[in-house]
A protein has these predicted regions:
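Glycine-rich phosphate-binding loops of nucleotide-dependent enzymes
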Residues: 1-145
Length: 145
């Protein structure tokens, strides 16, 4: 994937073709390839940021509150994108305070409080109440049982 000319200049045609290919894979409805990122919605900007990581063949994406400050539609768009990347085998490390988002998008949940690891559980083994209990009480109810 050479995006520069032999003299080191960016090859706009190659860059656009590669961008279209990646965005089609990640977000088939994305049509604003030539728009500046600053003109995009929050969800579209998240898609572009994720596409950059995919372009550089990241094995793991670390996402800190990827849906914070997004509207309902954009939140779902980013969630769908995260699910698609998981299905493609990309590792996702998601940092979130949204327990519903965790339950929907994660395989495992780790809870930390004051720098201490409270517990790591598979989402199918815990409820949102269990997670909230770990956050509030600072103990893992699964380990006490």
């Amino acid at each position: 994937r050479e995006l520069t000319t032999p003299l080191g200049f960016v090859d706009d045609g190659a860059m656009e073709a590669e961008t279209r290919k990646i965005m089609a894979r990640l977000n088939p409805n994305f049509k604003k390839i030539k728009e500046p990122v600053s003109a995009l919605s929050g969800g579209q900007r998240q898609s572009v940021a994720i596409a950059r990581a995919v372009y550089f063949k990241a094995k793991i994406l670390i996402m800190d509150e990827p849906t914070a400050a997004l509207g309902v539609h954009e939140t779902q768009m980013v969630a769908d994108l995260i699910k698609e990347l998981k299905n493609q085998g990309l590792g996702i490390f998601l940092i979130s305070h949204d327990t519903r988002e965790m339950m929907e998008l994660c395989d495992r949940v780790a809870v930390m409080k004051n720098g201490q690891l409270i517990g790591i559980e598979r989402v199918e083994d815990v409820t949102e109440d269990d997670i909230l209990s770990m956050i509030i009480m600072g103990k893992n109810p699964k380990k006490a049982a």
